[in-house]
């Protein structure tokens, strides 16, 4: 169920997360972001918060690292502009991952990697992901390619988390992908995009509870735009300012004892994404601290 307002006020959430301590440094030039990170209070309930680097797709790898460190996030899912999962070499992908590892940041997965019914294309993706040291990536197989993906999941022992992409996608809702993968290896699971699911009239919190056994990543975002099948320029907003019931989503993750990553994917079309990311992270940390 979607709630335009939340029982936990934004003021309470932001206070709990000490957003002021994180926001002002992030308004400085990116070169200054490598300063010592702040320390945030509150309980996380075991939820691992990270960043989907698609949020910062126009920034360099070095700039992304600086932002992640300042936000005190520990994990990142790397978009293809930062690591060429489908087109590059194993060494190119490994080199990018190493840059994050050297800064104490764990690369847990990828941006969305297309997985057509083409053995050479799918093998290259698995080679690059596995060769770079990852045990999981976010994929978008077709229904026809699921048996092929299962073959490689078993060969490489790598998890594939299927990303839902809204009303016009082959998997409009995460529950659609869940139903499609039930006959296949359990290492084929879900990356639940709560925003795209909402656009397809899905209740993200309910799906988290229903599909708990196959969820391997969550993309956190918010929107106040119309349900027109895509995130319009007016649609994506800072997490907590939109129409999604973020509190219910986080409560569902806490209830299932979610052991994987909830990655912020902030898509508001603004020149500088960093302040909005800071507020989004602070809001969610505040929610968790108050639970």
Predicted feature residues:
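N-terminal secretory signal peptides
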Residues: 1-8
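C-terminal segment of N-terminal export signals and the immediately downstream linker at the start
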Residues: 28-59, 66-67
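Conserved, mostly hydrophobic/aromatic
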Residues: 51, 68, 100, 160, ...
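Active-site beta-loop-alpha junctions enriched in small/polar residues
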Residues: 52-56, 81, 112-115, 142, ...
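Acidic/histidine-rich catalytic cores of soluble enzymes
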Residues: 75-76, 155-243, 247-250
């Amino acid at each position: 169920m979607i709630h335009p307002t939340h029982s936990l006020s934004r003021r309470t959430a932001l206070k709990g997360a000490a957003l002021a301590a994180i926001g002002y440094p992030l308004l400085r030039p990116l070169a200054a972001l490598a300063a010592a990170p702040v320390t945030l209070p509150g309980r996380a309930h075991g939820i691992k918060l990270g960043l989907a680097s698609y949020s910062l797709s126009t920034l360099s790898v070095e700039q992304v690292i600086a932002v992640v460190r300042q936000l005190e996030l520990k994990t990142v899912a790397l978009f293809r502009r930062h690591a060429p999962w489908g087109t590059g070499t194993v060494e190119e992908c490994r080199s990018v991952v190493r840059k994050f590892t050297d800064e104490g940041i764990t690369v847990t997965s990828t941006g969305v990697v297309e997985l057509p019914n083409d053995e050479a294309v799918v093998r290259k993706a698995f080679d690059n992901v596995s060769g770079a040291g990852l045990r999981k990536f976010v994929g978008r197989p077709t229904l026809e390619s699921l048996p092929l993906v299962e073959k490689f999941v078993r060969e490489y022992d790598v998890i594939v988390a299927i990303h839902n992409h809204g009303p016009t996608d082959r998997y409009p809702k995460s529950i659609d992908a869940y139903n499609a993968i039930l006959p296949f290896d359990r290492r084929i699971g879900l990356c639940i995009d709560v925003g795209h699911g909402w656009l397809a009239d899905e209740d993200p919190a309910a799906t988290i509870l229903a599909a708990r056994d196959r969820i391997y990543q969550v993309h956190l975002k918010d929107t106040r735009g119309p349900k027109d099948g895509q995130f319009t320029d007016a649609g994506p907003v800072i997490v907590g300012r939109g129409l999604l019931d973020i509190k219910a989503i986080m409560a569902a993750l806490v209830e299932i004892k979610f052991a994987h990553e909830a990655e912020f994917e902030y898509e508001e079309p603004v020149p500088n994404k960093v302040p909005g990311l800071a507020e989004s992270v602070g809001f969610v940390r505040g929610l968790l601290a108050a639970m």
